[in-house]
Amino acid sequence: MEDKEIGTPLPLPHSEARLQPTLVLTTLSAAFGSVFQYGYNIAVINTPHKVFKSFYNDTHFERHGTFMDESTLLLLWSCTVSMFPLGGLLGSLVVGLMVNKWGRKGTLLINNVFAITSAVLMGVSKVARAFELIILSRVLVGICAGIAYSTLPMYLGELAPQNLRGALGTMTEVFVIIGVLLAQIFSLQAILGNATGWPILLALTGVPAVIQLLSLPFFPESPRYTLIEKGDEETARQALRRLRGQNYNVEAEMEEMRTEERTEQAEGRLSVLNLFTFRPLRWQLISIVVLMAGQQLSGINAVNYYADVIYTSAGVDPTQSQYVTLGSGVINLVMTLVSAVIIERLGRRILLLSGYAICCSACLVLTVALLLQSTAPELSYLSIVCVFSYIVGHSIGPSPVPSVVRTEIVLQSSRTAAFTVDGAVHWLTNFIVGLTFPSIQVAIGAYSFLVFAGVCILTAAYIYVVIPETKGRTFVEINCAFAKRNGVEFPEEKEVATAKPHTPSLPTKETAF
């Protein structure tokens, strides 16, 4: 099949790919050994924080004969908490170099060094009587999480067939939440969240890393990376056959990747600095920044931080609030799985917009309930409903969907640079919220949730105006949709509209798509 005007062979129509065992197992191995670490280490120190502080204090007494004053203990604990997102930021800054040199799968495997090292250090910290090992390990496991959170969506997005790209893309957030939930379960006082069990609790972060080291080498590297960046067409074809099944015609997908490769030959590999000045990717880059900043600044971490106070004000016994928190974690996981099921039916935009609408409404009602519950105590129960509603809203859109969209709106040659920016924004905003929210909450109290409602409105407005629906489109077609907004001429746009499911060839030098 050939376009007579351009003389470029066009790819055959895509058939619907079915979910194959190899693709499922690759996803499980890659996700469990990577972003699971992110979720687990976010939550693992929250419930038993008094146990850790006691260890810090006892260690100080053994060394100096006196206990720490409250300000010193608070400073050390703040360092323990904040070192994780700081490590995540460091990891996100090196991920571009790693995935270009060692590939997506290779980067995930090398990344396990950070997880295993931190697990060993945290596991022996009690025997060594050195709380400093915990703080150092939080940096290392943060680096692991930062690398994983940028690499896994890239890997899964490039492994997935077009009709399953959304569902597989949400697995990044699904496994983050599974990590959070298991950490909440294991850190219960009756299990490992106690004075004797906490070293094991922290060291468990090494188990997924070992499992991945033993399993992931047997699964294929990203076919797009193999073909477009390494030029190894036969290995890419073999990988596609393993991922799609032997009865699937992989040639249409191979031709689509060749088309993408041709569009990028004039562009070359973009660095992070070049990305900021590259006109054809201007709105894609802005969209990535808005999606990741909106995800964090919309208040999910603040709601989790404030949840225990809300539960206590509603009459929940402080010793039982850990179980209410566990219940919210279950809701989070269930709704994220629902998002994974419906994303290819409803699309990305509707999940993002409806999710932000729910979050905004929950923040507004929560503000009113918190302000009035001193005069109307029954409103404290409404506060709990608002927390759970917020979690539902964030779980169906703002949490899982950006991982899908950020992979889809950039092409292969710019993806690593874009994900470096993406990861840096994610971890920096995460760090800012964790650092500033306690002070904001003290200063303005319940009104702090109005700030998050405003962020939800602004982010949703941007998505509505700027970000197109990406469901069912190839990577090249999605970038064509951004062309007019970027002020770039695409002579093939008419062909895309009239000749679907053909994928256009884009040889124009200026567009570099």
Curated annotation (Swiss-Prot):
Function: Probable sugar transporter. Even if its physiological substrate is subject to discussion, it is able to transport glucose and fructose. Does not transport galactose, 2-deoxy-d-glucose and xylose.
Residue positions the entry lists as glycosylated: N57
A GO molecular function held by the record: hexose transmembrane transporter activity
Record organism: Mus musculus
Gene Ontology cellular-component annotations: apical plasma membrane; plasma membrane
InterPro entries the UniProt entry points to: GLUT, MFS_dom, MFS_sugar_transport-like, MFS_trans_sf, Sugar/inositol_transpt, Sugar_transporter_CS
NCBIfam families membership: SP (TIGR00879)
Signal peptide positions (record): none
Stretch list, region Disordered: 494-513
Extracellular side: 43-78, 129-138, 194-198, 304-322, 373-380, 438-446
Gene (UniProt): Slc2a7
Membrane-spanning residues: 22-42, 79-99, 108-128, 139-159, 173-193, 199-219, 283-303, 323-343, 352-372, 381-401, 417-437, 447-467
Matching PANTHER family: SOLUTE CARRIER FAMILY 2, SOLUTE CARRIER FAMILY 2, FACILITATED GLUCOSE TRANSPORTER MEMBER 7
Cellular location(s): Cell membrane; Apical cell membrane
Protein name according to UniProt: Solute carrier family 2, facilitated glucose transporter member 7
UniProt keyword terms in alphabetical order: Cell membrane, Glycoprotein, Membrane, Sugar transport, Transmembrane, Transmembrane helix, Transport
Cytoplasmic side: 1-21, 100-107, 160-172, 220-282, 344-351, 402-416, 468-513
Catalytic activity: D-glucose(out) = D-glucose(in); D-fructose(out) = D-fructose(in)
Membrane topology annotation: Multi-pass membrane protein
Family the UniProt entry places it in: Belongs to the major facilitator superfamily. Sugar transporter (TC 2.A.1.1) family. Glucose transporter subfamily.
Binding site for D-glucose: Q295, Q296, N301, N332
